[in-house]
Amino acid sequence: MIKNSKTLWQKASKIIPGGNGLLSKRPERFLPDGWPAYFRKSKGVFIWDLDNNKYIDMSLMGIGTSVLGYNNSFINKFVKKKIDEGVNTTLNCTEEYFLAKELLKIDKFADQIKFARGGGEAMSLAVRLARSKTNKSKIIFSGYHGWHDWYLAANLQDVSNLNNHLLKNLKPLGVPKILKNSAIPLEFNNLKELIKISKQKNIAAIVVEPSRFKYLDKKFVNYLNKICKKKKIILIIDEITSGWRECLGGVYKKIGLHPDVVVYGKALGNGFAISALVGKKKVMDTAQDTFVSSVAW
């Protein structure tokens, strides 16, 4: 039934570590030997695999990216137009400015925007800016925030620290040991733990997801807002998964969080690679003081 997919996956696994670039799309995480690894085409909620089997995607819709459906004709019309005009030149594209203006209308707390490609690199950038602004090192986090060193550093202290978000007992190989104790995990909605951890010194930022199966509760949110304001800790809201799914912009508005920076990804591009940091000028301006630059941004 899925012969062509299985054959290609076996070949790919020999020349690509893990078979592909994204852990969440590997067949063994769903149904080993029974999950179609590849798609041939897609439209709306439907996917066709290499053996021409047709499926309704009741899973993650592109790992949370395609809230407007696959292969959206309205979006494709504008993308194709831009491709025909030219995509990347020595000069800047005007769309960067116009999209920034539109996002600032939605996130009224913010003054400035910085774009990136994937959610993980956008989170890494947000953490860099927080550390740059505060001249402090520690990051308290609650949620899944990518694969970069700042995040995996949590497992330098205890290999189980990221068990709720990544592979069990993941050894952070390749992450400099000097980063030990720089990333402090915080259990989702655990107010007592937040009160205890926030007493530490040298905290640059607290990073949270506003929802993960459920919302942060009111007492947690109120204390988080209060302690960040009191201790001048940068509050970063990771809306990469939650953003644009329930409301225009981020869930943080619905539950009363007062962010300094909000990070969007996934659904922002409906399958096209784009992410954004939306934040207050006092934080975003530090991008001029620390080097952040990419030809693909």
Which sequence ranges carry the predicted segments?
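Conserved N-terminal phosphate-binding loop of PLP-dependent enzymes in the Aspartate aminotransferase
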Residues: M1-W297
